[in-house]
């Protein structure tokens, strides 16, 4: 782990390594979760992009990517390094698949405290609103509770004004603006614009990077059991109606809807 300079503002992005469901759909196989191809959780990638945009405006921001996983399970962290992270840390747990949201939050809080002992206090802690596998949206607020920090969720945009973090967040009426004193925790949804892509050079550097591992002292007892994963059923495929007249098209549409039990 790099030693940030004394002027750096430390920002930690918590991210999860999740099954690559697109590959699972193509293979159409049932596999135990540890054998599935993996990728960086999409909303965590948006949290990383929000962090990178803050660094674009303030070069003193130092981004550390943090993930829980088995020893050597660092693919998501290498993706983060290739995209925007300055360094990365893997907090080692024997079996992350059996941890519920509260256990994950407690372990992340433990890891963050260990990082702070070496690199100094973290002013900002970002994460995705939820993961594509768990979808509980509980880790962000529970992590803030474990660290006794203010929290804002469903973030769409982040900006800094002195010692205050401003989060534009989505809500039922559109968007709202939340201000929090630093340090704080924020969870991000799909933010406007697409996340930046890694370059060939950054990907090569990330593939060679040495990612330090943290040994956590307090591992909660397993609470979940994942027996298998399977691709979702694809359902009925789209149909193109190419009749000469509108009347013939309407007749075919009626027949298709009737056969599908819609009518």
Predicted features and spans:
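N-terminal nucleotide-binding beta1-loop-alpha1 segment
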Residues: 7-26
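Electrostatically charged, flexible surface regions
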Residues: 3-4, 153-263
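Glycine-rich phosphate-binding loop signature in dinucleotide/nucleotide-binding domains
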Residues: 112-122
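A short, N-terminal amphipathic alpha-helix
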Residues: 43-60
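Residues at the starts of beta-strands that form the adenosine-phosphate
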Residues: 10, 60-64, 87
């Amino acid at each position: 782990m790099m030693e940030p300079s004394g002027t750096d503002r430390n920002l930690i992005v918590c991210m999860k390594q999740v099954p690559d469901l697109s590959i699972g759909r193509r293979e159409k196989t049932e596999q135990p979760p540890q054998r599935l191809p993996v990728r960086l959780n999409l909303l965590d990638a948006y949290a990383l992009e929000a962090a990178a945009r803050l660094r674009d405006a303030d070069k003193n921001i130092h981004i550390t990517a943090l993930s829980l996983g088995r020893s050597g399970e660092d693919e998501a962290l290498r993706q983060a390094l290739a995209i925007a992270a300055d360094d990365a840390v893997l907090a080692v747990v024997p079996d992350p698949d059996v941890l519920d949201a509260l256990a994950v939050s407690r372990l992340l809080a433990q890891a963050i405290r260990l990082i702070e002992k070496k690199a100094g206090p973290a002013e900002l802690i970002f994460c995705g609103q939820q993961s594509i596998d768990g979808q509980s949206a509980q880790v962000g607020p529970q992590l803030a509770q474990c660290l006794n920090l203010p929290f804002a969720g469903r973030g769409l945009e982040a900006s800094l004004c002195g010692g205050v973090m401003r989060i534009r967040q989505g809500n039922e009426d559109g968007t709202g603006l939340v201000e929090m004193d630093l340090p704080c925790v924020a969870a991000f949804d799909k933010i406007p614009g697409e996340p930046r892509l890694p370059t060939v050079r950054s990907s090569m550097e990330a593939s060679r990077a040495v990612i330090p591992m943290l040994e956590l002292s307090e591992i909660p007892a397993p609470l979940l059991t994942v027996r298998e994963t399977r691709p979702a059923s694809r359902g009925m495929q789209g149909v193109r109606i190419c009749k000469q007249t509108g009347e013939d098209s309407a007749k075919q549409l009626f027949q298709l809807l009737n056969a599908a039990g819609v009518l």
